[in-house]
Swiss-Prot record:
Part of the twin-arginine translocation (Tat) system that transports large folded proteins containing a characteristic twin-arginine motif in their signal peptide across membranes. TatA could form the protein-conducting channel of the Tat system. This is Sec-independent protein translocase protein TatA. Residues 51-60 have a biased composition (Low complexity). Pfam families: TatA_B_E (PF02416). One of its GO terms (molecular function) is protein transmembrane transporter activity. One of its GO terms (cellular component) is TAT protein transport complex. Its main location: membrane. The keyword Transport applies. Signal peptide: none annotated. PANTHER family: SEC-INDEPENDENT PROTEIN TRANSLOCASE PROTEIN TATA.
Length: 82
């Protein structure tokens, strides 16, 4: 009673194909595959380019003056818990 049989899954698959159509499902599958491939490439590129840059680049100095005097931004100062 707790699990679905093969007939339940076939009926669900048939309803999904009838609602979306095979062309739309194929497009969604290729879009999902492209997104996963792009994510993996980005993770691979990000890990190889960030490692040397982080070790050789000097740390930026934080000053009390805001770099941008835009009125729509909020200046927030971090404080330690006491």
């Amino acid at each position: 009673m707790g699990s679905f049989s093969i007939w339940h899954w076939l009926i669900v698959l048939l309803v999904v194909v009838m609602i979306f159509g095979t062309k739309k499902l194929r497009n969604m599958g290729s879009d999902l595959g492209g997104a996963v491939k792009g994510f993996k490439d980005g993770m691979k590129d990000g890990s190889t380019t960030d490692a040397p840059a982080a070790s050789s680049a000097p740390a930026a100095q934080v000053t009390g003056q805001p770099a941008n005097s835009d009125k729509s931004t909020i200046d927030v100062e971090a404080r330690q818990k006491s």
